């Protein structure tokens, strides 16, 4: 099967963006500027990353591969941190969380023999793991901000009665973690029925037997 990007496919892709812009403008959602900037950034970033990955795959260097993974994790942590305006050391917390989840998962996959430590496998998988972690952490941060604002008085009363900061904040933290994990859990429940894993979809497009 020959898959190629042509002017017609690019035109129809652009039309999808136009539809989103029309809806945003008509319903006064305030997303018009964000959509335009996001699309422009996506195009520039994908083109740049395409050339960069082509070079990295050809060189097949251990240090360069690790640097690419570090860049992915750092960028994911930076974007997750922006979801909370109140959290101190948000970048560091996000970096450690995303770095640990990515490192542990990659380590298990390598030692189990599922993948090899080569750029063409490590970098895409690291990106998928870091992306999922970034979304979960971002949701958690946003929910933390909202709940602390709404329940500020209740938390202050608990502290006044002698509760520790951790104890007074525990229900809010638990609820925020649940909110952050909900999309991942829902995706896991419906995998294979509603959606296919990104890597599996890519292999199917490449003509590999789904089984």
Question: How would you name each of these model-derived features?
Answer:
Residues 191-211:
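Glycine-rich helix-loop "coupling/hinge" segments at transmembrane-helix boundaries
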Residues 19-23, 44, 48-56, 71-75, ...:
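Alpha-helical membrane-inserting segments
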Residues 21-33, 75-86:
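C-terminal ends of transmembrane helices
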């Amino acid at each position: 099967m020959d898959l190629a990007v042509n002017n017609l496919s690019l035109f129809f892709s652009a039309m999808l963006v136009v539809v989103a812009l029309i809806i945003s403008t008509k319903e006064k959602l305030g997303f018009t500027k964000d959509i335009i900037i996001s699309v422009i950034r996506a195009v520039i970033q994908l083109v740049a990353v395409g050339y960069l990955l082509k070079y990295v795959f050809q060189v097949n260097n251990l240090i360069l591969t690790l640097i690419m993974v570090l860049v992915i994790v750092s960028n994911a942590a930076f974007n997750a941190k922006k979801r909370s305006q109140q959290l101190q050391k948000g970048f560091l917390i996000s970096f450690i969380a995303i770095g640990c989840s990515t490192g542990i998962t990659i380590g298990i996959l390598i030692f189990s023999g599922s993948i090899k430590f080569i750029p063409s496998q490590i970098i895409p998988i690291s990106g998928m793991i870091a992306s999922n972690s970034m979304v979960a952490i971002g949701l958690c941060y946003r929910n933390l901000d909202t709940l602390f604002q709404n329940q500020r008085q209740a938390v202050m009363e608990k502290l006044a009665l002698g509760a520790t900061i951790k104890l007074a904040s525990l229900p809010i933290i638990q609820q925020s973690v649940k909110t952050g994990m909900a999309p991942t859990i829902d995706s896991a429940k419906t995998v294979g029925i509603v959606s296919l894993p990104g890597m599996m979809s890519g292999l199917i497009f490449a003509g590999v037997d789904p089984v």
